[in-house]
Amino acid sequence: MKEIGGYIQLDTYTGEMLHEEGILLNSGRNCLLYLAEAKHINKIRLPYFLCDSVYNSCVNAGIKVKFYHVDMNFMPEEPQKLDDDEWLYIVDYYGQLSDECIASLKQKYNRIVLDYTQSYFRKPLNGVDTMYTCRKFFGVTDGAVLYSDTKLERELETDESYSRMEFLLGRYERAASDFYPEYVNNNKLFAKMPVRKMSRLTYNLLHAINYDMTGKRRENNFNVLASLLGALNGIDVNSVIGPFAYPLYVEDGAELRKYLISNKIYIPLLWPNVIKDMPDDSVEYLSLIHISEPTRH
């Protein structure tokens, strides 16, 4: 029975939500696990240049994993052949993959999973299993979207987010550094989080966002950085819709990151596991060390 009265709750927002027509889940890695269960994926080829949480999720689910490399422009070095029941996991790093490249990969391998974690404002391509992560772009603690022609037959529980909101609410009124430990703890929770439907709280907050304004602001910031830093950049970077970040490749990228952090400009180190796992002359290692992301917002 629904409770009535007592005290006021959070307002219900009614704006349009980007990707509302997809399968709404609680995390990006759980999009992959949902897809693996629905499509009976037992083998997958992952890029070395990737968060180890994806690999760990696959291993824990009993999925056999092989790896492949990417080049300096984040393009996949395509395997000559996949096993008959193997899937290829493609990451659209910084939104740099073209629709033509994705379509070509789909035609060549058929069984591909497209990771749009860094490309929330891109539309999915028809017939390509595609996943998006909400918290990489917006002020929510969780949430992800999957596009697929196959759905699970079993009913999923709905996630709850209220207990994970402190670092977001705290940063709104105080310094980000005051709540960084809570942010880190929230990230750790995803490792053991089962596949669930997106929480009602996250779903509601995603209806409060002006996606057109947010996307254009990101594009403006990206274009300003490209005009100022493009001549210094060691890689070619294409303009994209609603970009995740501007990737700047410079030889002293690690020192630049330290300098920016010392001036309270926080440059994340994506996937530090790559530094531990890859040789220091590999493309993946060099990309992680030398790429700074001057702004995301």
What are these regions (language model features)?
Residues 197-226, 235-248:
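Conserved glycine-rich beta-strand-loop-beta hairpin in the small C-terminal domain of fold type I
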Residues 1-18, 177-195:
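N-terminal "arm"/small-domain region of PLP-dependent enzymes with the aminotransferase-like
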Residues 147, 247-251:
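Short hydrophobic/aromatic beta-strand micro-patches
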Residues 4-22, 26, 33-107, 111, ...:
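PLP-dependent aminotransferase-like
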Residues 238-239, 253-287:
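Conserved PLP cofactor-binding pocket of PLP-dependent enzymes
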Residues 289-295:
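Conserved small/polar residues in nucleotide/adenosyl-binding loops
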Residues 127-169, 174:
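Active-site PLP attachment segment
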